[in-house]
Amino acid sequence: MTNKLGRLDPKTGQFKEYPLAEGKNSGPHGLVADREGNIWFTANFGGYIGKLDPRTGKVTQYPMPSEKADDPHTAVFDANGILWFTVQGGNMVGRLNPKTGKIDLREVPNESALPYGIQINSKGVPIFCELGTNKMASINPQTMAITEYKLPESVRPRRLAITADDIVYFTDFKSGHLGTLNTTTGAVRLYPSPGGAESNPYGITITPDGMVWYSESGVKPNTIVQFDPKSEKFSRANIPSGGGVVRNMVATPDGHIYIACSGVDKVGVISPK
């Protein structure tokens, strides 16, 4: 790892790199932009949340208030500008107030939960995956009380995306499913992924037209899968470079999908038809 953040200009295909703190590799893992254009990232090896100002290159560090929380993992902003994040090995979920720099942490009830992907629903409630268990969970944004939702025993959820009407889609990394969770009723549905039980579904997103997209990282080459919630039909295509494990992906407002091909040093884009 190079201890840098990278910026891609989609119009030119040019990259610009921003070096982070000197010395120990901070292990930048998840990142998200705020409304002012700052880039916030989880220093998975450094035990802090970082903020990069791309205009100046300045990096501000917000250290974790607990030594146990040494591996912040995935981050997301809610509508109020609060940054929520998972701490995988530390088994916690946290929130950071950018105005004050204050960080609050809450331990997940199951000590082997391995909190992973996290997203915010339309009501402002963070929902996250427990990769180490067969559970999803939500955290009350005011009290930080955690509610868990049990999934079938074989399931290990890794990442998630949420529809406009708050249906949670998640990738079942262990047993090869695309799943849905209704957090109001607790109802769960599983759809076998086209690549089979060892397809290791991973990164996932939902485009503005309601289509669900995710990657299968256990097949070679990696695939991109489209799921239509209305017809419940799948479409599937290989990633030309092989993918090298697509750990995350994001949909833009105009329907493009950017994928991080972590093992082949590439960023890919899927254009709408």
Regions from the language model: what does each represent?
Residues M1, K11, F45, R55, ...:
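A generic "binding-loop/recognition-motif" signal
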Residues D9-G13, D53-G57, N97-G101, N140-M144, ...:
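Short loop/turn segments that connect beta-strands within beta-propeller blades
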Residues Q14, E36-N38, K58, S66, ...:
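Tandem repeat domain/solenoid detector
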Residues G244-K273:
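Blade-level signature of beta-propeller repeat domains, shared across WD40, Kelch, NHL, RCC1
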Residues N3-R7, G47-K51, N91-R95, K135-S138, ...:
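A short loop-to-beta-strand structural motif that recurs across blades of beta-propeller domains
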Residues M1, I39-F45, L83-G89, P126-G132, ...:
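Conserved beta-strand positions in repeat-built beta-propeller and related beta-rich domains
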Residues Q14-L20, K58-M64, K102-V108, A145-K150, ...:
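A short beta-strand motif characteristic of beta-propeller blades
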Residues G23-E36, E67-N80, N110-K123, C129, ...:
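Beta-rich, blade/repeat-based domains predominating
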